[in-house]
Amino acid sequence: MLDAERQTLNKRMILPTTYMGSVEWYRQFLANPSAVQIEVMESFPKQTYRNRCTITTPDGPLTLSVPVKRADSKQLTRDVEISYQQRWQHQHWIALVSAYKRTPYFDYYADFFRPFYKQETRFLVDFNEKIHEVIHQLIRNSEFKIQNSKFTTDWQGVNLEPCFGNGQSILDTLFEYGPETILKLNNVNSIKLV
């Protein structure tokens, strides 16, 4: 094995698939996106962020879970199918609107997320990957310009400061800071994101 290949392998980072990943997950991912491999060959563990996310609401943290079909305990993550027996998509969308409608960037980004709650995707990893692609694009798109902005930043005492810990979804930060999300993630600690 060549030294360059060995260095590349040593720099690889394996992350689990996540449903609207946490701030911490995106900080790890954005530190070196080309070195990240999403783990899909593991046995699917229950009660993890692979099919859950935690958002901040006025009443405190709210966990949203994507229901999945389970064949057996040894089922690989890549084979986990989403269950549509419940109206979870409608419930999740209502929760997102309720939690974020008063944040500065929700109106600008909502249309990027709405389709995920209208259409069905068979496999959880595919669903997560599609959402991740949108989030990554929005975070990295420094040329995103808000045209004819009319929103006010006077929130009259409402604390909309996103939580950077406790597994909170990246959506808290994205809807609050919009194109400045990458800058806010850089300020969490001294790791410089590329």
Give the ranges of each region predicted by the language model:
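Residues lining hydrophobic/aromatic ligand-binding pockets adjacent to catalytic sites
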Residues: 2-194
